[in-house]
Swiss-Prot record:
Keyword rRNA-binding: no
Reported modifications of this chain: Glycosylation is tissue specific. Sialylation of N-glycans at Asn-93 in brain and at Asn-42, Asn-93 and Asn-117 in thymus.
Protein name: Thy-1 membrane glycoprotein
Membrane protein topology class: Lipid-anchor; GPI-anchor
Lineage of the organism: Eukaryota, Metazoa, Chordata, Craniata, Vertebrata
Organism: Rattus norvegicus
GO cellular component, one term: dendrite membrane
Positions of the pro-segment in this chain: 131-161
SS bond list: C28-C130, C38-C104
Entry comment describing in which tissues the protein is expressed: Abundant in lymphoid tissues.
Signal sequence annotation: 1-19
Annotated localization: Cell membrane
Length: 161
């Protein structure tokens, strides 16, 4: 086999295997709603399929996604926001009946399909409230956050530059 073709194939496989790795899955409460943030890599041009599910009492319930069929009971309560590096699921009116293991799964199809997932155990009484500062930290680059912090500290005469 031609070495150039071998290297190209190897790079394609490596890109696909890294293209959708789930980095983190976090949960918090916004009013009475559960918010799940599924952060992931995206180093592929292929479509990334996704699925959010809940496992409760050893039974899997698909909430949203393109891999499985979402259960009818959750369709009216679920809202999904999808961007290049994050998928955010909001489950309205979260109660103790919705507690369990939540999973975010991503899959890239193609010649060598790959998948990646993360699971988080969600208990209502242990959930933190989603806050403005945590949103800023999650959605702003660290450099910008550092610059904003330095400006604030300088304005309050906490530091002098």
């Amino acid at each position: 086999m031609n070495p150039v073709i071998s290297i190209t194939l190897l790079l394609s496989v490596l890109q696909m295997s890294r293209g959708q790795r789930v980095i983190s899955l976090t949960a918090c409460l916004v009013n009475q709603n559960l918010r799940l943030d599924c952060r992931h890599e995206n180093n592929t041009n292929l479509p990334i399929q996704h699925e959010f599910s809940l496992t409760r009492e050893k039974k899997k319930h698909v909430l949203s996604g393109t891999l499985g069929v979402p259960e009818h009971t959750y369709r009216s309560r679920v809202n999904l926001f999808s961007d290049r590096f994050i998928k955010v699921l909001t489950l309205a009116n979260f109660t103790t009946k919705d507690e369990g293991d939540y999973m975010c799964e991503l899959r890239v199809s193609g010649q060598n399909p790959t998948s990646s997932n993360k699971t988080i155990n969600v208990i209502r009484d242990k959930l933190v409230k989603c806050g403005g500062i945590s949103l800023l930290v999650q959605n702003t680059s660290w450099l910008l956050l550092l610059l904003l912090s330095l400006s604030f500290l300088q304005a309050t005469d906490f530091i002098s530059l």
